[in-house]
Amino acid sequence: MKSKVIMCLMALFTMLSMSSCGYERVDAGCEGIKVNLYGSDKGVDDVSLVTGAVWYNPFTEQVYEYPTYVQTVDYPAFTINAKDGSEFSIDPTISLKIADGKSPQVFKKYRKELADVINGTLFNYVKDAFRIQLNKYTTDEIVSNRDMVEKAIEAHLSKALLKENFQLEQLTSGLK
């Protein structure tokens, strides 16, 4: 009888210890972000987890996966007015990525999936960059110096995205 109780206790201990151990495989090209759900240090850990196997306690922690490779986004077209009031159509496509090691800061700030951040918040930065830069030039200046105008837009957007821990790789304006 005593041995049955000991066996039951051992089985219970084994089941509890196995259920308190979580495993997540973080793919190559992604960073795993470990979030503490409880306690005085709850929130996002400051350290990005490397790719590969990640062991964690599923009762007190959760692991999110953020892609860190270059992604190309084709935003919907919109219109912007130049300094003299003429209207230009913009159909932007950008290639960007999270700055290396910055995925915990991005997750901490937005608490959303990366696609939601790119299609929401970052789209606003794209529209602002075009609006701010095109409002500085007249129609003639934009048409005559398109390369210079697009470089100014790209520099403005790159600086704005860097503040949000994103790195702009390429911008195609689709300016018409």
Q: Which residues does each PLM region occupy?
A:
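Amphipathic, coiled-coil-like alpha-helical scaffolding segments used for oligomerization/assembly
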Residues: S89, I118-K176
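Bacterial N-terminal signal peptides that target proteins for export
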Residues: M1-C8
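Hydrophobic helical h-region of N-terminal Sec-dependent signal peptides
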Residues: M10-T14
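Hydrophobic membrane-anchoring helix/hairpin
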Residues: G22-A129
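C-terminal motif of bacterial Sec signal peptides marking the signal peptidase cleavage site
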Residues: S17-S20
